[in-house]
């Protein structure tokens, strides 16, 4: 199987062979050793299965790919409102440390920055959509200078395509190959 092949590629001694065998809806609490871990379903946002793990006694939350700190997030699934709500939920938790899926550990300031980015691109994309601008043009037109220190600005192509899909009320995303092509073209233009 693909699973067994991947074990061989990375070294099976480094992999846990037990697959997940419990599902939940919305939220659940688990005991891991002496730790209480609260799991919250916050997707679909980045992907369909977004979950955050909150360890209240340690005042830490593990966000998975809900947070890309110092990098442009990528909105594969959406809707963006779920992602913004996930940020609000994280901010409402009693946490000192936020462990993102990508980049350095942060605090609530990092979460607010991602929330502000998502709100900004939503509003900017909506204005352009309402004015009849095509998604590909909007990607190039939206001013990202406030986020110029963040990596991977080409992800705006996927984000705007996802937002336009959301505005049209469609579920099916663009072909992934097309989205990667658009990101590549944005990289080439910045060259």
Language model segments and positions:
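Single conserved hydrophobic/aromatic residue that forms the stacking wall/gate
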Residues: 1-16
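Glycine-rich, flexible loop/turn motifs
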Residues: 5, 20, 26, 68-71, ...
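Residues that recognize and position ribonucleotide moieties
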Residues: 7, 22, 60
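Solvent-exposed polar/charged
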Residues: 7-8, 92, 140
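Active-site HxH/HxHxD metal-binding segment of metal-dependent hydrolases
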Residues: 12-13, 17-32, 48, 123
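Metallo-beta-lactamase
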Residues: 29, 36, 41-127
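C-terminal regulatory/interaction regions
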Residues: 133-191
């Amino acid at each position: 199987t693909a699973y067994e092949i991947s074990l061989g590629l990375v070294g099976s001694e480094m992999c846990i062979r037990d697959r997940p065998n419990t599902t939940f809806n919305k939220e659940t609490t688990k005991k891991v050793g002496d730790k209480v871990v609260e799991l919250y379903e916050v997707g679909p946002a980045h992907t369909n299965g977004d979950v955050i793990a909150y360890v209240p006694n340690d005042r830490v939350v593990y966000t998975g790919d809900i947070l890309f700190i110092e990098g442009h997030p990528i909105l594969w699934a959406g809707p963006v409102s779920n992602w913004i709500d996930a940020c609000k939920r994280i901010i409402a938790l009693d946490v000192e440390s936020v462990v993102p899926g990508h980049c350095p550990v942060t605090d609530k300031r990092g979460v607010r920055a991602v929330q502000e980015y998502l709100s900004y691109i939503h509003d900017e994309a909506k204005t352009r959509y309402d004015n009849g601008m095509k998604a590909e043009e909007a990607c190039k037109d939206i001013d990202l200078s406030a986020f110029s220190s963040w990596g991977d600005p080409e992800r705006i192509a996927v984000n705007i395509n996802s937002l336009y899909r959301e505005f049209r009320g469609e579920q099916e995303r663009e072909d992934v190959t097309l989205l990667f092509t658009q990101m590549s073209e944005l990289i080439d233009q910045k060259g």
